[in-house]
Amino acid sequence: MSISVIIPTYKPQDYLWQCLDSLEAQTLDKRLWEVVLVLNGCSEPWLTEIQDYVKAHLTMRLSIIQTDTAGVSNARNIGMDNAAGEYIAFIDDDDYVSPSYLEALIQIADIDTIAASNTIGFSDEQAHIPYYLEKEYNSKAKAGKQPFYNAKKYFGGPCMKLIHRDMIGEQRFDTRFRNGEDSLFMFAISTKIRYIRFTDTNAIYYRRFRIGSASKTYTRKQALHNGWKLICQYTHLFHKGKYNRYFYKTRILGVLHSILVN
């Protein structure tokens, strides 16, 4: 198995079908990849709805795991624990990908190189929303294989990329954090990453923006508390391992910025 695609989902709506349909349409041989869908914090009627949809519409290899414990980080951890692929791809359940997404990523990924795709933001009201990672892609993609920290903005989360299992090892998402755990996870595995390389423009991760999503419902007091804990954890990791100093500084600045703008 070359790739395991991990999708956490909680009380999914119709957008999950769009996500799964986009994977069903992948050009990469279906024998080379699997989907691990983790339904977290809920059960019925969503579990039966997913099972019925998969049976009626999909031919790809897909396993469904249900856990009563809610939380995207816990769901991703469960997905990794049950994944069979040499590479891991994370996709959020309200996003979707272009047909060549997996094939383009696997062609350029390596044991020390993260493969990253083009990305486009959208919403239910707008087909195209300006997105800072689209700008980052446009400015970095043509440079070819490059040190990972050259494209530091792409390391704010695990989506839009293909990650070798050896980079992850036993590392998992820290479930103690309500926000910022995506960036913390990417920092934690960065000692195993040397390079990043981008796909062509046709391999696209479509990022949906929704009002009231988990990353948006956040008070200032919570932001301050969570931000302080993140800074402490980043610093602990930095002094514990051989992390890039420049990359560490950018993560701390990112946390401070998120506190100020909250």
Label each region the model flagged.
Residues 2-4, 34, 184:
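Cell-envelope/extracellular polymer assembly enzymes that use nucleotide-activated donors
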Residues 3-15, 19, 26, 38:
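A conserved hydrophobic helix/loop-capping motif in glycosyltransferases and polysaccharide synthases
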Residues 20-66:
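Acidic donor-binding segment of Leloir-type glycosyltransferases
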Residues 27, 184, 191, 198-262:
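C-terminal subregions of glycosyltransferases and related glycan-biosynthesis enzymes
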Residues 59, 98-167:
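Flexible acidic/His/Gly-enriched loops in nucleotide-sugar-dependent glycosyltransferase catalytic domains
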Residues 66-83:
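Glycine-rich, basic loop-to-helix element that forms the pyrophosphate-binding segment
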Residues 88:
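Short aromatic/hydrophobic "clamp" motif used to bind/position activated sugar donors
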Residues 143-220:
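Conserved nucleotide-sugar donor-binding catalytic segment
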